[in-house]
């Protein structure tokens, strides 16, 4: 779904099998449980993605609380995309991005206060991620403990940035834009950029 489109990303019940595949470089955003597909963080990162030569898409998960249904919706949406795929997720959207990354052969994942290792969510198997990852989390997050991002970063050798912020990270959007830009640039560099 492109910015400004009010329809759900792709409804598997009504998806047209004859739709064309879009080839290129794609960033696909997954929003959190309490937000929408064009919330403040996502909207602020769209221009960064476009400036680095990516098409920006945001999947609408409103009304889907089950993370397995969200993963299925993301997989269905990404069937229409070919080429480089970068997944970006915030909160529950971060969980969805991680759970989908290997299946979708993502080139990288960028996670903001991801809901990892949370009670009530299906457990992710260790080592589930096979691409570069960067995590951004707020020290004062009272929804998802920042320690969960530390654990994930340690396990997956991912970059981690802990910022003076809370769960929504709104006071750090400019910093997150810079971190996201660096992440996208580094994906085009030799492997040393993530080691």
Annotate each PLM feature:
Residues 170-186:
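Post-His helix in hydrolase/transferase enzymes
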Residues 35-36, 139-144, 168:
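Acidic catalytic loop of the alpha/beta-hydrolase fold
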Residues 88-97:
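Gly/Ala-rich beta-loop-alpha elbow adjacent to hydrolase catalytic centers
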Residues 105-117:
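A conserved short beta-strand
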Residues 128-129, 135-137, 141:
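Short beta-strand/loop motif that positions the catalytic acidic residue
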Residues 154-169:
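Catalytic histidine neighborhood in serine/cysteine hydrolases
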Residues 42, 145-153:
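Short alpha-helix in the alpha/beta-hydrolase fold that links the catalytic acid
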Residues 2-64:
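Short, surface-exposed "cap/lid" segments of acyl-processing enzymes
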């Amino acid at each position: 779904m492109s910015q400004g489109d009010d329809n759900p990303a792709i409804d598997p019940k009504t998806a047209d099998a004859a739709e064309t595949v879009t080839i290129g470089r794609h960033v696909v955003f997954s929003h959190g449980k309490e937000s929408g597909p064009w919330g403040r963080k996502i909207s602020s990162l769209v221009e960064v993605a476009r400036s680095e030569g990516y098409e920006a898409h945001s999947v609408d998960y409103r009304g889907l609380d089950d993370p397995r249904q969200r993963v299925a919706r993301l997989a269905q949406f990404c069937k229409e995309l070919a080429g480089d795929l970068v997944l970006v997720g915030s909160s529950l959207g971060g969980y969805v991005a991680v759970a989908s990354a290997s299946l979708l052969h993502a080139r990288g994942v960028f996670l903001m206060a991801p809901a990892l290792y949370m009670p009530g969510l299906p457990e992710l198997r260790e080592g589930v991620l096979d691409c570069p990852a960067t995590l951004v989390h707020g020290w004062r997050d009272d929804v998802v403990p920042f320690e969960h991002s530390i654990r994930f970063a340690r396990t997956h050798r991912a970059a981690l940035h802990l910022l003076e912020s809370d769960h929504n990270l709104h006071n750090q959007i400019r910093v997150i834009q810079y971190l996201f830009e660096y992440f996208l640039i580094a994906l085009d560099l030799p492997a040393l950029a993530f080691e």
